[in-house]
Amino acid sequence: MVQHDRAPKVWAGCARGAFAGLLALAVVAASPGARSDELLKAKVGVLRLSSSAPVFIAQDKGYFRDEGLDIELKFFDAAQPIAVAATSGDIDFGVTAFTAGLYNLAGKGTLKVIGGMSREKAGYPLIGYFASNNAYAAGLKTPRDLAGKRVAVTQIGSSFHYSLGLLADKYGFKLSDVKVLPLQSLSNAAAALKGETVDAALLPVSTARALIDAGGAKLLGWVGDETPWQLGAVFASTRTLADKPLVTRFLAALVRADREYHDVILAAVTDGKAPINENTRPLLEIIAKYTNLPVEQVVGNCAYIDPGGKLDVSNVANQIGWLQGQGFVDKGFAADAILARDYVKPD
């Protein structure tokens, strides 16, 4: 009788154990990253530049997946097309430089800025002024000498064009005195510089590094040293903003990567370069992977990014005012109209 009495208890215990195991499996399956068919999917438009480093880190180290996201990166060769792609629905988020095109679309209510990204800051090389060898030999030696020269940029109203305008304001020459040549892409601008069809170009250091190392152009200086400003941002279409869980999770993963990039890479930068050591190498290798550059070149391409993803809102207002004054951006809206205040952390 004792044996018969124990059997039901044993089976009951086993059943309870099995139920607990199944419950645990169910909890795991429901957690972010457990099943790919349960992840929120999104496409992110970026350039293959170190200024997008946190995006690459979050993707490669699984921070997006930890937040329950399945992110696809779509790469572009200029910043303004990223804003267009977000508006058309080809991508959900954009992470790139502010441009006149972005501001015009945002001013029409199709896009909103949700966070900050790269900044032009002294000591952290990002965009540089570069001279062709012939122009350099003829006397183009410093950024202030660009007045009256043929200067390549990607597009009218791009971050490179704006940087040139800030330089003109600083040194008191007219932007109209510069022959600005919009060549539509970074690769085209670099090729024109090497081919001596322009006197100078504004390029990100990651694009220009190989050209400089090969003796194809001369460095005149860095925008961050001459005219610091809030270069990059994170933005989304109004359609994407309607999905609050998606936006919240995306920014959480990105800020996690912002902090790591800042604390590991930027904190170690001296004389414009990050050291290669056991702490920095893993992140430098990730950046190298996505920018198609060797680690030895990445160390000098470390753009400054706020560790909390903050945005210099007052500088954004200045950008809009300047671009409107030049006729590159439609008038009738101010910075507050293009910011998603629920997400932007002002600096």
Regions found by a protein language model. Give the residues of each.
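Short, glycine-/small- and polar/acidic-enriched structural segments
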Residues: 37-173, 179-183, 199-205, 220-222, ...
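Bacterial N-terminal signal peptides
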Residues: 16-29
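N-terminal secretory signal peptides that target proteins for export/translocation
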Residues: 1-14
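Short, hydrophobic alpha-helical packing/hinge segments within bilobed ligand-binding/sensory domains
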Residues: 81-83, 100-101, 188-192, 208, ...
